[in-house]
């Protein structure tokens, strides 16, 4: 579909719609002589060395200029909204926030939640890995950038503003506030599509640089049964109109600052506080600014992913500045590395401050990718500076604007330091891995490590392709690293597998039923109730109301009894489909629509679930206070006997920390704090409590249920809870586990379950005390004494074993038989498998075969180097006679026979084969 985007301003002020002679795309301009759209590669940068904005701005100044303009606009005042975290806890379909509109997806755009202001303005830190291989090279690409934006949400019956006003606001900001030349601004038409939405759009271009994108989101992906008359085709995909029309704009903060300064690269304009110290530390040779300027001008014409090879860019720049490609590479490479390090460490600062913990999965994987890529760049520069020192520079510079960085500084730096140590260990182990792979390749006659294997080395072992190449080339094996390698692995990490939960029954079967009244929320202590049967679907019964809690939010379903016509029927499962609750029963044939039934839940099971669920929230509050604000819930489950809570954390939890967590949690229990729950509109809840609400994951709906433990923990949670913490009873941490990189599991018990655990421990102590015949308080020192005595005794046993092995060898040497020219020893002996191996190795000579079998059936075969036999052949011969299995190398094999009675026969078989 072609959109002709004629606006009020274009008509009234004499703008001309033209077609770019290079790319063929339509654009609007005030310049009648203009023939190109202003977008690279149609136009080069014209502002480098000649700033396109009269005044020089810093990041803070430009951000404030933008936000103030929209906030204080006379006709369209916008509400100023604080930045959202780069880790989007409110949604589960993306790993990181990559644009300001993502802050408001899906809830605001779908109409399920109100925007925090309408219209609104925001400057949103955004992280994208799609251009990671361009960072440092092109002069303009970042992994972290701020997208300044103004958004308007036009709901049915509530129009805010649309295309005309958006274009006018953008033009007013650029020309009146920033004093850009109107005749140099172009609006290029380029429909936008992404994330399931689409619409017409303008790219705003100035002096060869895209400074803003104005998207008019008004379509959504067409369903299979869409009305053909409503369908439009955008970029090859089918879309239908949305009810809500959204103004989605994005202005590049860093690009506008760069435009105002005219520096050789955007990095020089916004990251000088890191770049300059790194240049000094690395002793980087000062180069002619013209080289950097020409590099940026030409790099602006294409992306590395598009051109395929960085060498092409080098050749073009070298030609322009009149030096060789090799000399250009030598001069410019250190700058590119420093630029990339400065960008990557800034992205890390935001990610770690907002709760990302480096790991092998999801956003943690992307953080680790940045860490290891930065370390690799430092290594290439020959710099020994710790990465944490560079991150500290960002924290110092950015904390006045983002005070949360200072608050999290110690934890951020410790995470980075630990990751550096892990990476050093990875490199130490990695060399052997690569060499083993090279040996396999050489056996197959190959002499190049394929791309898939490079990706595996990186993803599974953390080995960067540059390190693999370094090792491989020493072994005479080639490695080709694609210019877009890191973009490829980042794309793989960002792919989200959409797991569809299997529905208990087809939603179509319950969609016409009324919502089930949730008595378990109205009164969590309700044990019995009456209800009417609305429908029976196979062995599931739907009631008009229920006190049975359905499975969800980490809390298991209730069980119990439904009494129908005097018959007690067991309820074995309770699930929710949409807003309808279904009860699985043992005898569904007894239930008829319209019948009144009496429900009775298993109260002991439910109350223990309530203790554990409320205890989970108390424990979470203690974990955050002891370990730090980077801690987020990564999963939970509970039962009657125990509960588990998975959290993001970058190292093992120490014993001292466990004691403090347990102490704090039990203090909150003893203080008997009030536990309140309330239903709030999503936007109000977000504004009131922030995004820590979503500890338990994404919660759907316009209205969400908030659980609030007085001055301790607030979460969006759909479970059943106790009205005060005192009812939880004692909380006992049973153990912690490292379930995956970056995730700790805490297993704990509350109430009676905790008491049972203490009783078990007391019984163990009592029994141990009786066995050792010492009072409980003397158990540690007694156990230590016994352990030391056992160690000494073990040393003596080992000494004796070695003496016996010597005697065995001496005895067996006297039993050598001659079979032709071959010496043969074959005996059934006393001793362990270790004894057999040691004896066989000592007895092995170049012209000798040794077969030793012990009373348990373990055997060892040793064959001399000069003999034309293999130990493995003899192992197979032995097991063919006496059963069992075994195998080994040419000179030594081992195994175990099944029939010990046939051991002598097997030995004779080997002897007879010589």
Swiss-Prot record:
Cofactor field: Zn(2+)
UniProt-listed SMART domains: tRNA_SAD
GO biological process: alanyl-tRNA aminoacylation
Subcellular localization, as worded in the UniProt entry: Cytoplasm
Pfam families documented for this protein: DHHA1, tRNA-synt_2c, tRNA_SAD
Domain of life where this protein originates: Archaea
Cofactor binding, per record: Binds 1 zinc ion per subunit.
Catalytic activity: tRNA(Ala) + L-alanine + ATP = L-alanyl-tRNA(Ala) + AMP + diphosphate
GO cellular component term of the entry, any: cytoplasm
Alphabetized UniProt keyword annotations: Aminoacyl-tRNA synthetase, ATP-binding, Cytoplasm, Ligase, Metal-binding, Nucleotide-binding, Protein biosynthesis, RNA-binding, tRNA-binding, Zinc
A GO MF term: zinc ion binding
SUPFAM superfamilies: Class II aaRS and biotin synthetases, Putative anticodon-binding domain of alanyl-tRNA synthetase (AlaRS), ThrRS/AlaRS common domain, Translation proteins
Residues annotated to bind Zn(2+): 613, 617, 717, 721
Free-text note regarding domains: Consists of three domains; the N-terminal catalytic domain, the editing domain and the C-terminal C-Ala domain. The editing domain removes incorrectly charged amino acids, while the C-Ala domain, along with tRNA(Ala), serves as a bridge to cooperatively bring together the editing and aminoacylation centers thus stimulating deacylation of misacylated tRNAs.
Similarity comment text for this entry: Belongs to the class-II aminoacyl-tRNA synthetase family.
Protein purpose: Catalyzes the attachment of alanine to tRNA(Ala) in a two-step reaction: alanine is first activated by ATP to form Ala-AMP and then transferred to the acceptor end of tRNA(Ala). Also edits incorrectly charged Ser-tRNA(Ala) and Gly-tRNA(Ala) via its editing domain.
HAMAP family found in the cross-reference section: Ala_tRNA_synth_A (MF_00036_A)
Protein name (record): Alanine--tRNA ligase
Organism field: Pyrococcus furiosus (strain ATCC 43587 / DSM 3638 / JCM 8422 / Vc1)
